């Protein structure tokens, strides 16, 4: 009763994963060894450290997961397919999980991927910390935001959520969070506004 991996599944996942690597001088997700695809959401046993000697343990439903230690990535196919079918809703499971892979490239799950210079790290930290705090505040007060409030969980989830918005809702992200958009455009070395399916007027570079 397992899921047969068809060309549609392989190509849908690969095409979206490759989008994050365009124009970047990088290896092809060097930490990733395997991708497991479920037909739909699945249940996993989770144990979380809450601080001090406090742990939380139980089962949770998941759509996807990235495991650095095992070099693995898990996706629910029905959600991955929905994300590909609607490229402008700001939610994309494949982009989200592969963004975690980029975050892991420097062996730290902190929302700061490997950057080229000290100045880039400083600029990244300044903008990301401010924007992360703003999203947490929005999540607590119920203020509408371009970003999925799941990104308020921690810096790693914030990076993955902003990646989704950067590629799927670039116009809205740049309008509401221009410095954040600029940091991601610098990191990914592309401007998704040039090809986005997001509704709105296209802006072409004039040179």
Where are these regions (language model features)?
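Extended, charge-biased low-complexity segments
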Residues: 33-35
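Short alpha-helix carrying the canonical HExxH Zn2+-binding catalytic motif
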Residues: 86-103
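Conserved, charge-rich beta-strand/loop surface module that forms ligand/interface-binding patches
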Residues: 25-29
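Active-site loop/lid in soluble adenylation, ligation, and acyl-transfer enzymes
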Residues: 1-16, 30
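Metalloprotease/metallohydrolase-associated module, dominated by Zn2+-dependent proteases
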Residues: 10, 14-23, 40-88, 105-207
């Amino acid at each position: 009763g397992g899921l047969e991996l068809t060309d549609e599944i392989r190509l849908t996942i690969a095409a979206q994963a490759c989008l994050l690597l365009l124009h970047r001088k990088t290896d092809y997700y060097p930490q990733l060894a395997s991708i497991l695809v479920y037909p739909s959401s699945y249940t996993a046993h989770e144990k979380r450290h809450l601080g001090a000697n406090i742990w939380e343990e139980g089962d949770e439903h998941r759509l996807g997961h990235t495991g650095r230690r095992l070099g693995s990535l898990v996706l629910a196919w029905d959600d991955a397919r929905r994300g590909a079918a609607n490229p402008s809703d700001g939610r994309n499971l494949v982009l989200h999980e592969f963004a975690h892979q980029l975050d892991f490239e420097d062996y730290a799950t902190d929302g700061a991927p490997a950057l080229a210079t000290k100045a880039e790290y400083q600029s990244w930290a300044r903008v990301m910390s401010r924007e992360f705090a703003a999203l947490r505040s929005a999540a607590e007060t119920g203020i509408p935001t371009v970003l999925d409030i799941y990104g308020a969980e921690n810096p790693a989830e914030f990076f993955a959520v902003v990646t989704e918005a950067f590629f799927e809702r670039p116009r809205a992200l740049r309008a509401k969070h221009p410095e954040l958009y600029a940091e991601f455009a610098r990191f990914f070395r592309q401007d998704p506004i040039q090809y986005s399916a997001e509704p709105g007027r296209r802006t072409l570079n004039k040179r």
